Amino acid sequence: MVARFLVVLLALLATGEACSGEQAPHVAGAVAPKPLFRDPVHDGAADPVVVWNPLVGRWWMFYTNRRANVPGLADIAWVHGTRIGIAESDDMGAHWRYVGTANIKLPENLGGADATQWAPDVVRAPDGRFHMFLTVVPGVFNDWKHPRHIVHLSSSDLRNWDDAREVPLAVPKVIDASVVALPGGGWRMWYNNEADKKSIYFADSEDLMKWADRGRAIGDQAGEGPKVFRWKGSWWMVTDVWQGLGVYRSADALNWTRQPGNLLQEPGKGEDDRAIGGHPDVVVSGERAFLFYFTHPDGKGTRRSSIQVVELASDGQVLRAERDAAARVMLIPQ
């Protein structure tokens, strides 16, 4: 009963309402720092996904842990050989600390212990088990020419992942899964098809195990790192188009309309935020929504990267993100 009361109270705070129904004088949540998080090992945190960990009662962030500070790595070897880092927050998402890396078991045909791990997405099934959809490159390479796969893994504790299975999709060169539960049942995955001019494709599943590819979802502009979520009566897709984030809106999660302009294309003023924003995640928390993204703060072509957060705003038709405004973060446990 106490736990339920706390969740309801947090929901009221997140929507900016007091218990009396009157508008609260201040937006709830602690102010997030800039940067929100830097990886203390390799200083290359990117591609965040934020999920509630009910086992520890804290929010966890999974991220690609690029080897930004490792000397002697030629060409793009530094973005290969990566593991998935984990950070956690005990204040509803405003401050984060490093936890370690995810224990991910991959078979030898997918690179085994030498595989490159990128851009996870994590969802929780109705039975309580967690499912990760991970981009896997079977080795460490100096170029972009090699196969990439989206691999499904499962876990009971969010730390240890096994039962790896490649998801059969349109081509053997795919990255960046975004998976959501559909209102009528089943699941939908969006991903980047690198062989089709880096268009965004999608696939459907009844059980998170067997997937049917449905073809191209959007293809007006090349992009990667799609994130799909439902908020304020619409479906939204945010993609990394390397000039900020492209935004699409849909009534049915099938037919998408592009929003003019890009989010986070103009550099911010905060520390490590004076660069375009890339590869996002979005957490919907009550009536509010928070976009997590990464930057290369030292400029284009540099390696170091940091995680940032901004609160989204919308009238139901257009998404907005004021990255220089103080982000008071309050993520409701889910």
Stretches with model-predicted labels:
Residues 5-14:
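Bacterial N-terminal signal peptides
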Residues 1-2:
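N-terminal secretory signal peptides that target proteins for export/translocation
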Residues 19-334:
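Carbohydrate-active catalytic/glycan-binding domains of CAZyme proteins
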